[in-house]
């Protein structure tokens, strides 16, 4: 049984899969409840609006992206070389098209949803590429 304190991350993880499987139009509170096997109304209890759910999904993906990049960067300690940078980028792409594939699909599904919301749009774009860290 999932403890209530653990539900927000679990719900956002299921929302990511709903987005990956069905696109932005598939993302509803009911769809996330069904996918997560939660009682009806559970997702809307934690995220009252679709906008709140989308913001939570963007934040969840952002945290995963940042953690994955930080871990990869830590493994390639030492001076930055062209070969090292290429290996880091290749590793990130393998990660994004492998274990984080659902997150990548969710990012692209949400781009249209957040086009008029600069903060969320920028956060989504930073999940794919950070100019500051390039």
Describe the role of every protein-language-model region.
Residues 56-59, 67-104:
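Hydrophobic alpha-helical connector segments
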Residues 86-133:
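Short secondary-structure transition hinges
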Residues 1-7:
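Short, Lys/Arg-enriched anionic-surface-contact patches
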Residues 7-10, 14-56:
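Helix-turn-helix
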Residues 10, 14-22, 67-71, 75, ...:
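Solvent-exposed, amphipathic alpha-helical segments
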Residues 9, 13, 51, 55, ...:
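Generic detection of well-ordered alpha-helical segments
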